[in-house]
């Protein structure tokens, strides 16, 4: 079995080992009175701790922590398990008190594991078949504790703690490097492949055996067939296709689609009553909407069962398996995270020795995910979070055509849909009660532009036992509601986020206000500019104003239409007041959370935005809601790359909320059109939607006009300084569309390669321009997308032999 922790840590100095050997841990239940060797005790401790930790990933941390706290003198493994449980709650919820508890618990683990490491290194070499050097199991626990404490330190609001975190990170990497070197030595001695090779070979037509002896449960791991029920402790084999397609594939596309659809359809949402105490039970509540076959990968073999001839098959001893899966999970997560750091910060990290490697990190995480233990579960969660979360923001990804023609058999490029669906299926079977996997399942549908089905699934999930998981699911629902243009659900979801999570109330209030602003504008425009009767309902004529338009009405001439008008005006008044209240409340809650002693970028964005609107309202003598220019909800769609999730119908509808006549004051429109940053916000939002609708030429015309603005006109004061950088980024996306879409290539086949080369170079130049842009509020948000784009462009250029 095994446990987890990708990147975290604690104290700033190496714990001093105790003068004498550490005390023997209290024997686990069932072995009292039995004399056990040190090796047997260690195995018992590991097994007991891992059994408890399985509950964490099944949405039941209370059971896990209750079990782990039973030990009067807990082992390093039990302390690590307890630390992981509290740590996960702290990073999922960003709650200060939970972070403090996590820091204390992880510090205890750090000290104990160091002492056990020193003690273990003094022991005689093990004679029970272990391959790793003595003490390695405690060294990896120590490294995991350092990594966890490093993450918690970074999340604290102190710059000093953040600097300590980097020191812990260096220590953890040094420990992991030594363990990795030992693993490499073992691989060479045993004549196996590199320990850092691809853990999943390309699927073949022959299926491997699905049953392993208990003592071999960690070797030759594969995923079982989709219709088999899997225990969380059972050996589960995993093989995936190496990428979305392979150049030597002979399978038919229809087979791929049918296989993947069947696997996703096989996923079911268990009833909570059936999964509260039984991790392995997969109770059925409802069928999951299937994914469209039209989004299936290019021709290539679907994920099948076969021997995953990875280096992991070499390790059969539980302690070795724990170390092997942990080092892959920890090192892999570090490599992946460091590879996604925005360019400016990555250069700084490189100076002090922190360099990421996305390809290496992903390979290591896939290798760890093959193991049915806590390390494998964490690796799986990281992989799915990366592909369905972070990669969902990326625009510059290799086309399926280029992957099929250029990728190596063991190369993971872009979004490996088949792998992810298979991994998700296994995790759902292994941990049927966990809301995390259900949320990932909904993300798959949302990524297929099936927002309605994804939203329905998120709503079916209900509240998880871990409040932090509920918060994550609710946030995903809230963002999806923005893209679905469902203003009531968008409002209610973000208001609920205030109750569930205290990371950024300013952002939650602001976006909830955006929803009610759109509802106010909807009501005003459905009225056609009409207003309501007098509030006291008197029979006399009253002239009332809605936006710019005044109407006269009398109570005695009410008919069905008048009743509807009255209802709409009542709604307009209500939503206008609510929107203004939420917008004004947002800045008052900003600044409560800081990252490395800096205010959260989105909170700075919110404060500037509201201040700008207030200034305009005062200057024009308007109410706040009437002084707002281009739709802030449309701006949120852009900042979350919502166009990538929306189908053509939703994109066309979203275009309407950007129309100038949606503003409720003509004076506001006239004023806004004089402000370059506001005009640019309107134009970039429109261009992004046009790009996703396949209307790139129209988008390019808008963006070229915006790019001609002087940067100085969009800087200073409360102006939105990110918008010109984003316009340049959008131009890069249009160039990439030209690279990847055959319908945009020259009709003369001889000219295609040169056309693609030039467009690739153009995309790279534009991305480099954005990467080197001066600091702006949302630079980190765009930085990750830019870094992913640069990596993709370099990959294609290298494969094609082009010089950038």
From Swiss-Prot:
Its main location: cytoplasm. Residues 1-32, 190-218, 232-257, 271-310 are annotated as: Disordered. GO terms for cellular component: cytoplasm; cytosol; mitochondrial outer membrane; nucleus. InterPro entries: Iml2/TPR_39. Keywords: Cytoplasm, Nucleus, Phosphoprotein. Pfam families: Iml2-TPR_39. Residues 10-32, 191-210 have a biased composition (Polar residues). It comes from the Eukaryota. It is found in: Cytoplasm; Nucleus. Belongs to the IML2 family. Interacts with lipid droplet proteins. Inclusion body (IB) resident protein that interacts strongly with lipid droplet (LD) proteins. Involved in LD-mediated IB clearing after protein folding stress, probably by enabling access to the IBs of an LD-stored soluble sterol derivative that acts as a chaperone in inclusion clearing. This is Inclusion body clearance protein IML2.
